[in-house]
């Protein structure tokens, strides 16, 4: 998993509440269990004017020119500004996969659906909850200034605007450790590899009959 330390990223808007996981990545694209390749279909029903199909090339598909992610000013954005209850709906882990594959490293919102919130941390995506008034301010500043960038410092737990104003955010210490060090469930297990091997060696000596192979 990619580590997350400091991000200086262009911000893009998803200015609507209750964005569910089917809106983030529609159900017809959930056949793959690989974590890559979903970015082209992120917000598919909003980005395109036609109905997206699995394994379909997105080149030449008619774009919804009124959808912000299709605006030139938001190309290459890595911070998504969102509204309350982002990621509600079904528990599909493909939602953070699609956001990550598109290029987003962080989502800032007043609130998140619990399962989506947890899935983000497992996939190297940093969900940040800020007070609704602060999120409103960030939206206003972003709309007023093209090329609006936010600096996110995970170690310091701050979001800093181009004017230098900083806002603190809360994060569980264990999740913070995992993101800073790029540790998913497998990475966490490998951190304990020496202890696991030592236990297996000791257990084999204490109870060798458990390891006998029946021939």
Curated annotation (Swiss-Prot):
Keyword field contains Endoplasmic reticulum: no
One Gene Ontology term, aspect cellular component: 3-isopropylmalate dehydratase complex
One Pfam family recorded for the sequence: Aconitase_C
One GO-annotated biological process of the protein: L-leucine biosynthetic process
GO MF annotations, alphabetized: 3-isopropylmalate dehydratase activity
Keyword 4Fe-4S in annotation: no
EC number: 4.2.1.33
Catalytic activity, reaction form: (2R,3S)-3-isopropylmalate = (2S)-2-isopropylmalate
Pathway info: Amino-acid biosynthesis; L-leucine biosynthesis; L-leucine from 3-methyl-2-oxobutanoate: step 2/4
Disulfide bonds: none
Keyword line: Amino-acid biosynthesis, Branched-chain amino acid biosynthesis, Leucine biosynthesis, Lyase
Coiled-coil regions listed in the entry: none
Enzyme class: lyase
Family named by the database record: Belongs to the LeuD family. LeuD type 1 subfamily.
Function as written in the Swiss-Prot or TrEMBL entry: Catalyzes the isomerization between 2-isopropylmalate and 3-isopropylmalate, via the formation of 2-isopropylmaleate.
Subunit (UniProt): Heterodimer of LeuC and LeuD.
Protein name: 3-isopropylmalate dehydratase small subunit
Organism, as annotated: Cellvibrio japonicus (strain Ueda107) (Pseudomonas fluorescens subsp. cellulosa)
Gene this chain is encoded by: leuD
